[in-house]
């Protein structure tokens, strides 16, 4: 049998390289999922343990190009205003409305919308990045967002009140011929969603629920010769009243807090569910000085008790009507504003940003030029003066 011969390889040649096996796709995806889960766990722990620090991190990233002074303020906005001016923050843009004009400035201070007005009494309502500017008793409404004018609306009645809500939805209370009052609900484009004509009760103001399914109107009616207040609740698919919650006192301000309707009267702060269930925070004879309903899960009230020598009291209340925290206030309060998890109080000599426990998150001294404060949900605040506004970045 013939012997087989094998050729020897060249030992001086480079040794063959081992070919690395490709990792199966499932294994790679599993590894990426583990890494992503670990990162999310770290972020979640950080958020849960210190939300204030997390908001500070967000601000440092979002406003890294802002030129700040030593106090942490960035001077962004220049405008003209007068004693009638109203202000709103629209996702970083500043809206200034007076009886003579509307001006909208973007986050760089550039005017993106301007129009002249001839209003006798201007009013403004803003929420969730949109605003309505109107004249009390007039028929024209300007609907705006951070980019400019959405729609100029000419309504069929005299406007009593407008309340902006979540998702751009808003309620307009007006006097229409043939009825005591009418409430119209619109979406963020100014398109009609719902109309309710009241022939029995005078409706003072109204709000849309956070989920956009209900409308609640503050009603005033007579019972045995005396006036009675209530919150009438309607589903936006029916003109039949779904529920009613009894209130005491006239309604000064209305909105939503923690998924419930919230009405501030001269007697108490009321929280009403869509089924009519009412919880309240009684003012105990004190007078309501200021109210902030813009936070996610709490309302803030500034109360003055003239019976006890004019003592001023600041309270934070949750949607169950329970006082979360409170403090005595010795300084004059020029303005207050709530957003997200924060409350900004503009005193005559300083600005203080609190959390819902009334713990100080930030303090800014020397605010003599500021007349209004607009709290932002990220923990920053806009300080508005007569002709200029600055952004405070703690």
PLM region descriptions:
Residues 94, 131-132, 169-171, 212-215, ...:
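Hydrophobic beta-strand positions that form the internal "hydrophobic ladder"
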Residues 50, 101-103, 139-143, 178-184, ...:
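Structural motif
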Residues 65-79, 108-116, 147-154, 191-197, ...:
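A short beta-strand motif characteristic of beta-propeller blades
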Residues 1-30:
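N-terminal Lys/Arg-rich, disordered targeting/topogenic segments
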Residues 113-218:
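Non-cytosolic head/periplasmic domains of membrane-anchored proteins
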């Amino acid at each position: 049998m013939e012997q087989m011969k094998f050729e020897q390889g060249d030992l001086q040649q480079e040794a063959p390289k081992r070919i690395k096996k490709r990792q199966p796709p499932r294994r790679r995806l599993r590894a990426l999922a583990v890494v992503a889960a670990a990162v999310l766990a770290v972020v979640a722990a950080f958020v849960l343990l210190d939300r204030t620090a997390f908001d500070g991190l967000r601000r440092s990233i979002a406003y890294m190009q802002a030129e700040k002074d030593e106090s942490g303020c960035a001077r962004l906005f220049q405008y003209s205003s007068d004693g009638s001016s109203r202000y709103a923050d629209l996702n970083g843009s500043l809206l200034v409305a007076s009886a003579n004009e509307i001006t909208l400035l973007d986050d760089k201070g550039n005017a993106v919308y301007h129009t002249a007005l001839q209003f006798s009494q201007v009013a403004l309502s803003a929420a969730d990045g949109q605003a309505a500017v109107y004249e009390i008793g007039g028929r024209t409404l300007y609907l705006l967002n951070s980019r400019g004018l959405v729609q100029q609306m000419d309504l069929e009645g005299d406007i009593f009140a407008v309340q902006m809500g979540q998702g751009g939805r808003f309620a307009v209370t007006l006097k229409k011929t043939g009825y005591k009052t009418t409430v119209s609900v619109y979406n963020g484009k100014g398109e009609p969603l719902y109309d309710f004509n009241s022939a029995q009760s005078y409706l003072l103001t109204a709000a849309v629920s956070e989920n956009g399914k209900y409308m609640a109107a503050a009603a005033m009616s007579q019972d045995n010769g005396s006036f009675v207040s209530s919150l009438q609740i309607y589903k936006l698919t029916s003109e039949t009243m779904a529920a009613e919650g009894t209130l005491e006192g006239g309604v000064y301000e209305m909105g939503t807090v923690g998924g419930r309707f919230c009405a501030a009267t001269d007697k108490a702060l009321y929280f009403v569910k869509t089924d009519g269930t009412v919880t309240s925070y009684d003012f105990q004879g004190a007078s309501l000085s200021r109210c902030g309903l813009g936070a996610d899960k709490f309302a803030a009230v500034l109360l003055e008790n003239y019976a006890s020598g004019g003592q001023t009291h600041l309270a934070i209340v949750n949607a169950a009507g329970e006082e979360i925290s409170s403090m005595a206030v010795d300084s004059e309060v020029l303005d207050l504003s709530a957003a997200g998890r924060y409350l900004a109080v503009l005193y005559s000599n300083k600005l203080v940003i609190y959390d819902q426990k009334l713990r100080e998150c930030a303090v800014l001294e020397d605010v003599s030029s500021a007349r209004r404060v607009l709290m932002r949900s990220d923990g920053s605040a806009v300080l508005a003066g007569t002709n200029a506004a600055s952004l405070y970045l703690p």
